[in-house]
From Swiss-Prot:
Keywords: Amidation, Bromination, Disulfide bond, Hydroxylation, Secreted, Toxin
Protein name per the record: Conotoxin de13a
UniProt domain comment: The cysteine framework is XIII (C-C-C-CC-C-C-C).
Residue(s) carrying 5-hydroxylysine: K18, K25
GO CC entries: extracellular region
Organism annotation: Conasprella delessertii
Domain of life: Eukaryota
């Protein structure tokens, strides 16, 4: 999981962390958003 949540939300509702792009409708190194 990422140490912090970032405002970037992927198509699947995950929150992308700073420096981690959305990949294949998922996020790399991220936590689930609301």
């Amino acid at each position: 999981d990422c140490p912090t949540r970032c405002p970037t939300t992927c198509a699947n509702g995950w929150e992308c962390c700073k420096g981690y792009p959305c990949v294949n409708k998922a996020c790399s190194g991220c936590t689930h958003g609301k």
